[in-house]
Design a protein with these regions (language model features):
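Conserved beta-strand signature within the Rossmann-like core of class I S-adenosyl-L-methionine
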Residues: 60-71
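A short, conserved alpha-helix within the catalytic core of class I
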Residues: 45-59
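A short SAM/SAH-binding and catalytic strip from SAM-dependent methyltransferases
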Residues: 35-48
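Short, glycine-/aromatic-enriched active-site segment of Class I SAM-dependent methyltransferases
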Residues: 70-89
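Conserved S-adenosyl-L-methionine
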Residues: 107-118
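Class I SAM-dependent methyltransferase SAM/SAH-binding core
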Residues: 1-27
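Short conserved loop adjoining the S-adenosyl-L-methionine
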Residues: 27-32, 47
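Short alpha-helix
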Residues: 87-106
Length: 126
């Protein structure tokens, strides 16, 4: 994935502004500041999202965008069956759970947008 990301950045002409790593995110440390943190299609597969949200909060990125799949859409049950049958747990959320997770993880400034299948969260430091 890192090779693909590097190739895409090179093709887009932004390779000098990008750095990609594969690592244990919860244990990782980098002295460089971040402009943004993205977690799109990530919390679908994380049993304990609070640990990651707290770590993302500690990055001090000025803008963060997260997605959380909605519980009880037409897509929920077929997706749950298909993924679990293949040994891949998947997790779904309701709006109050997303807001609770965010606040308990130290996020105070956020907008939760209701999309058709997901909640899209724009979180900010201030």
């Amino acid at each position: 994935m890192v090779d693909l990301a590097n190739a895409a950045a090179e093709e887009a002409g932004v390779a000098e502004q990008c750095h990609f790593e594969q690592c244990d995110f919860l244990a990782w440390s980098d002295p460089e500041p971040f402009d943004a943190c993205l977690a799109i299609g990530f919390f679908d597969y994380i049993a304990e999202p609070a640990d990651f949200l707290k770590r993302m909060r500690a990055l001090d990125a000025s803008d963060c965008i997260f997605s959380f799949p909605k519980r009880w859409t037409l897509r929920t049950l077929p997706r749950w069956i298909r993924l679990n049958a293949n040994g891949c747990p998947v997790y779904f959320y309701d709006a109050s759970e997303v807001e609770r997770l965010m606040r308990e993880s130290g996020w105070e400034h956020m907008d939760v947008h209701h999309l058709s299948r997901d909640y899209l969260v724009h979180a900010r430091l201030a």
